[in-house]
Amino acid sequence: LPSGLGTFGWDDEGVPAQRVELVREGLFVGYLSSRETAVQLARLKGWDVEEAHSGGAMRASSWNRIPIVRMTNISIEPGEWSFDDLIADTDDGVYMEVNRSWSIDDKRLNFQFGTEIGYEIKGGRLGRLLKNCTYTGMTPQFWNSCDAVCDRDHWEVWGTPNCGKGQPMQIAHTGHGAAPARFRNVQIGVMK
């Protein structure tokens, strides 16, 4: 992904950066991995260990840090919806843009995200401007509630230059491509 913040040529094990499909039709089919964890995953999943290979995700923030498996560019594939059709098909909701804050537990199960801006959706139309919009939930339920993703015309690459992980803490650039998407029954908070 040429414009992604998590883009690199080779990871810190010398493995070329590559596309790894993680989820297909709601099921995990691949994982970010290193040379070591690829073999461990193959054994755990009952896959052919001889076929196991690193996904090229072993990175360190500096020469004086041990490489760890890190997020690279993780993207949601574009869907088939136009933005106008997505809004028109939504009776009641909030359209949120631009990530502002995040909090997620170590197991990546419980999360809360805040956004810069939001718009009320009523009767299939964008309405008044909202500030300090947040959404919170549990990861499996959240992703299972996605029922629409906009098309490639609306797909953009976003990212963060300060994704922290590890002990001692390592900061890395990570990217994610996405188009506007709709999630049902998500707990939200807004200031009007």
What is the predicted role of each segment?
Residues 1-192:
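N-terminal small-residue-enriched
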